[in-house]
Amino acid sequence: MEDVKLAVDTGVDGVDVVIGTSSYLRQFSHGKSIEEIIELAQTVIEYLTKQNVEVRFSTEDSLRSNPEDLFRVYEAVDKMGVHRVGVADTVGIGTPRQIYELVKELRSRVKADIEFHGHNDTGCAIANAFAALEAGATHVDTSVLGIGERNGITPLGGFIARMYAVNPALVAKYHLPLLMHLDQAVARLVNVDIPFNNYITGFAAFTHKAGIHAKAVLNNPSTYEILKPEDFGLHRYIHIANRLTGWNAIRHRADQLGLQLSDEEIRRITEQIKAMADTQQLTLDEVDRLLYTHEQAVNGNVETKTITDQPVHLDV
């Protein structure tokens, strides 16, 4: 109770009460029985409901708790008047199906809002969070870049991507271009890198490299993109300086540079790029110089222009 009173004294408008209900936490953490948990919850909740604050009660390690014990606790605190109950997959053991079934059953038993908190130890945090929403949860815990204990929790960017892919209207109220700035700010403050394959904000998120992909994306980006980078204030990038590049991507680059090269010449240049990339790392500048060299050989001297500040950004 001392911690609860201290929290209220700070002037907060909501208090989150958490206690473990699994046999692991009951035996090796706080040592309380289910009956004692309910008694303690009643003491705390009765006090909080008189303080004009929002009350959230969450079990910890919900997925490894005995279902009968779990629902007994939830139904008890719901009757006590909590505003929200929380389901916590504390060790990331749950699967989307398990989360869906648990939250659906809980939804049928309590009137309070339902919040889901999922850890990512087994890589299911995003899928589990969305399954919880589908089953009737009203709130989902996320963190920027998924930062949290061990492997972290549901990442904000990944969850935004999941909802956007289902229906962009689900995230229409958010200013999506801020996501990149938010990820960058947090990464800088905690001294970590944004993973190259991070949802939305990783540098590879909208990068296309293989020739077959590049050709299709040039024709219609939806062939290999479920998210529209422009909706997040970003651009797609066709990476052409590699051995997997295709002639369609090289053609697009030549057109960007204003070069007049036939398809046969473009195909020949593409094969040369592939061969060079097998033995050395190429830069976009080197590819451009190769294109200009061929242009000069075919059509005479031409004035070169540099657009490497905007390398193959495609808004198509």
Identify the residue ranges that each predicted region occupies.
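A mid-to-C-terminal "edge-of-domain" accessory segment
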Residues: 168-316
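Electropositive phosphate-/nucleotide-binding environments in soluble metabolic enzymes
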Residues: 31, 35-38, 42, 67, ...
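Structural signal for hydrophobic packing residues in well-ordered secondary-structure cores
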Residues: 8-15, 23, 41, 45-52, ...
